[in-house]
């Protein structure tokens, strides 16, 4: 946020700095996959892999997408992470703003992400049945994305681990017809990609767990518990596109981010990080 608007940071540097931050945790054994550090048009490639030949400077006044994760084994247990955030990189003079189209697409992706996160469904429901929830807001604008909405995640094992998957049942990858069961972990990662210009993806990991619903029919009902707590870039949100319930979800999510991360940041004694967290978790 402070340095990228100067045009002095490139994709490789950003990925290396992220690994440096992640390595502070002594339980880190490896990344869970090659970090997708994608600026501007590269962000429109969902599985872009930066190297010394493709590496570009992150342009001021552009979108930057970062998809990363780690494999952890330590005293606190073992686990695998996978997270994507899409952020707006401003300009040195502070005047660069995302276009109306960027904000529209980002907000529609966010609405899909929220729809999955808030879903309640009966036991036996498949990922293929839930997939439409993530896409319907993009479909209303004649848009879509050509990858799955979610994949299973292991525990210090494969970051893509079956049998479950959330996606179109017509896709080439299996798992969308597998029932979603309590205890499974999935990703929640709708996106949008405009070739040659920018890409958007918002990804959290979610745990399937039982839900108690007053007055519900007999049977077991399930929902998702969020596992990932990193602020979502408010600069790219068109608040007018959100329903009151969606605004409440974003505000609650950011309040949880502030509560969960706040003490950890305080323990580090990093005033700049504390200020960043405070600013990026304010209510909409």
What kind of feature is each model-predicted range?
Residues 1-284:
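Active-site neighborhoods and metal-handling regions in enzymes and metal-associated proteins
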């Amino acid at each position: 946020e402070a340095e990228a608007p100067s045009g002095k940071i490139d994709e490789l540097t950003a990925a290396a700095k992220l690994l440096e931050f992640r390595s502070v945790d002594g339980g880190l054994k490896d990344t869970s996959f090659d970090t997708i550090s994608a600026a501007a048009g590269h962000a429109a490639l969902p599985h872009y892999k930066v190297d010394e030949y493709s590496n570009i400077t992150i342009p001021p006044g552009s979108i930057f997408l970062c998809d990363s994760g780690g494999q952890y084994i330590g005293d606190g247990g073992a686990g695998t992470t996978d997270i994507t955030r899409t952020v707006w990189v401003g300009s040195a003079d502070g005047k660069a703003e995302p276009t109306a189209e960027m904000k529209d697409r980002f907000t529609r992706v966010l609405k899909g992400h929220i729809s999955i996160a808030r879903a309640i469904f009966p036991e036996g429901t498949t990922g293929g049945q839930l997939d439409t929830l993530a896409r319907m807001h993009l479909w209303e604008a004649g848009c879509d994305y050509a990858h799955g909405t979610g994949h299973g995640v292991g525990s210090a094992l494969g970051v893509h681990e079956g049998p479950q998957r959330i996606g179109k049942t017509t896709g080439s990858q299996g798992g969308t017809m597998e029932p979603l069961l309590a205890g499974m972990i999935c990703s929640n990662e709708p996106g949008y990609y405009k070739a040659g210009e920018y890409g958007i993806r918002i990804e959290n990991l979610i745990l399937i767990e039982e839900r108690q619903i007053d007055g519900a029919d007999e049977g077991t009902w399930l929902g998702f518990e969020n596992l990932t707590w990193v602020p979502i870039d408010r600069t790219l949100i068109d608040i007018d596109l959100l329903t009151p319930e969606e605004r409440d979800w974003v505000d609650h999510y950011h309040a949880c981010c502030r509560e969960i991360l706040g003490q950890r940041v305080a323990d580090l004694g990093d005033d700049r990080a504390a200020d960043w967290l405070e600013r990026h978790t304010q209510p909409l």
